[in-house]
C-alpha cells in the first residue's frame, strides 16, 4: 500500500488530477458566491467596452483583484457564456498547484506526507469554497 501511494503521490500531475476530481462534485451544485457575479460583470464589460468597470463603459472599478478580472475576461472570450465551469476548474487546479508547492516546501523529503497534505488540504471546506465557488481566492 505504501509503495502504491508513493508512486501516486510522487507524480505531481496525478496528484493535481485527484484534487480536481475531489472538487468536481461542487460544480454540479451550481452554488456560486454572489461577489463573483460582480467580478464576472466587470470582466464582461472589459470584453465588451474595453473598460474595467461595473456600469458599461463607466470607468469605476468594482473588482478587488484585477488579475482575476483579466483571467475571467480571457475565459469569457474563449468560452463565451459557458465560461463558468472552465474558470472554476482552472481556479481549482491553480489552488492545487499552489498547495503542491507549499507541500514541497514543508515536506521536501517525505512524499507520503506531501501527498496527504495536498489531498487533505484540498478537501477542507474553506479550500473548497475558495477554489470552487467563483471567488478569486483560488488564484
PLM region descriptions:
Residues 58, 62, 66-70, 78-97, ...:
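Loop-to-helix entry region of an early transmembrane alpha helix in multi-pass inner-membrane enzymes
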Residues 29-42, 48-54, 59-71, 81-82:
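Extracytoplasmic catalytic/substrate-binding loops of multi-pass membrane glycan-assembly enzymes
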Residues 8-34, 123-125:
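Transmembrane signal-anchor helices characteristic of membrane glycosylation enzymes that use polyprenol
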Residues 96-98, 114-126, 131:
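Transmembrane and membrane-interface helices of multi-pass
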Residues 72, 76-77, 99-107, 125:
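Hydrophobic transmembrane alpha-helices
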Residues 86-114:
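Transmembrane-helix motifs of polytopic, lipid-linked glycan transferases
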Residues 32, 132-137:
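Short acidic/glycine- and proline-prone juxtamembrane loop motifs at membrane-interface regions
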Residues 1-9:
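Short, Lys/Arg-rich, polar N-terminal cytosolic tail immediately upstream
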Amino acid at each position: 500500500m505504501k509503495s502504491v501511494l508513493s508512486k501516486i503521490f510522487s507524480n505531481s500531475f496525478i496528484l493535481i488530477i485527484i484534487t480536481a476530481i475531489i472538487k468536481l462534485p461542487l460544480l454540479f451544485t451550481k452554488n456560486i458566491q454572489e461577489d463573483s457575479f460582480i467580478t464576472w460583470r466587470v470582466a464582461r464589460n472589459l470584453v465588451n467596452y474595453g473598460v474595467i468597470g461595473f456600469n458599461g463603459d463607466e470607468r469605476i472599478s468594482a473588482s478587488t483583484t484585477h488579475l482575476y478580472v483579466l483571467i475571467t475576461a480571457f475565459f469569457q472570450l474563449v468560452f463565451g457564456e459557458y465560461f463558468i465551469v472552465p474558470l472554476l476548474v482552472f481556479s481549482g487546479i491553480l489552488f492545487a498547484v499552489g498547495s503542491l508547492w507549499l507541500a514541497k516546501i514543508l515536506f521536501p523529503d517525505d512524499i507520503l506526507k506531501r501527498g496527504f497534505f495536498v489531498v487533505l488540504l484540498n478537501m477542507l471546506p474553506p479550500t473548497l469554497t475558495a477554489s470552487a465557488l467563483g471567488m478569486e481566492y483560488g488564484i
